[in-house]
């Protein structure tokens, strides 16, 4: 059995022993005492993190794909029931020398839910990639994704295995002219109908079998990749051809699809993550625990809105923010599991019906003897008067002309006004609305944590969109006396993502403080530490971010003594 772990495992155990040796006698161990368990935990975390990154990018690519297909020229459009899909994965394997490697797999194909048309698939005797609308789309989408979205994976020197699958129907072939576009072939290895074969084809003899026709369709895709995809010109590529002749006739049996494996794509990243784990740099790993259900008066609503409808971009890592914060609420702050509700990709109505209404019922049932926490990670926007609004998932901008895009990417320079601005804001949640929902119910405390930008910039630092302003300066909203709001940034500044940590910067540093204080930290200490550490790290990355707070008018300095643990 091969070793599934990485080379630093013995160093890891030495570090573990050193930590245990110097730890106070009453402290909980920070790591498992078993080397095997410790290595398993690290390995599991690394693979999970890599898959998380891959899945996030896959979602964004598929959003872009659908938008690009919509904007194809009429002559190249696919049927409404033809669906192109990119699937990506992280796969552990071994090299020919028996060494472990962590590979990236890019798979693009399409499904057809109709059988009456011929334009999407190859004409009966055709083999060139551009004679099939579906093959043309797959080739061009592959080029766009590899060259524009996956440049950090398809890097110089990496080995790839490119499997091209091409098929024919059962129509009998007597003779098809071959023009020699891809050269003459003698005894070339391929798989045909699940058997290893050797295929020959040249201009003199032409095409006389379905095996030859399917093979040339695959060679056509290869010719496109070699000529058009720049990233593949710097990798070491091995091509495999899988061909098939179906036993029925029809255009939907004449197809091509593509799978690319980038060998060792994540090996370096895995080593870097392992080193960081040894230094306890990840808040998602080794989450501390206190007595279960000890914080029984606290209830929390977590809103993690990561996925948005195209052409709006997703909010990077918002889902992970919500999931990990849930772990800290339950394990580190001792909030009972049933007291925490997580909403993923929730729209305005769902947030109210499933979240706010749930909290209001609890407050009434407990006669206000509860502490309320509401967390939001997602997009935000300011109205013409700079009032901040949360922008939930599911927001529909399809009827707004400014959002029309040819390549699936959000157009730059969008500034909405008038009816278009009103259409967007009507689907959002203003701070006044959010806090006003609790106007008729009183709790011991309300704490809001908002990790969002309101200035027209995404977490990634890329341009989002804006609403034309009627005033020149941002002014923080006023809230009632029992409310404290932690904000990742003021309404005219950007809340960024911390890419290496898979979190928003603000959320990451809140989690870090909860981790190393084990939840025993006041709001004042939390805010001071987050401000200092976040400003330092974000400035090193060239994207300075400073959090802010909004405090109820009559709280004065008393807010600073609040904590998340309320026994």
Residue spans of the language-model regions?
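Bacterial N-terminal signal peptides
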Residues: 12-21
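N-terminal targeting leaders that direct proteins to extracytoplasmic destinations
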Residues: 21, 27-107, 271, 277-282
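A solvent-exposed, charged loop/short amphipathic helix patch at secondary-structure junctions
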Residues: 119-130, 176-209, 391-422
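Cysteine endopeptidase catalytic domains of the caspase/legumain-like
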Residues: 29-31, 272-567
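Bacterial N-terminal signal peptides that target proteins for export
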Residues: 2-12
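Periplasmic OmpA/Pal-like peptidoglycan-binding modules at the C-termini of bacterial envelope proteins
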Residues: 98-100, 155-158, 172-286
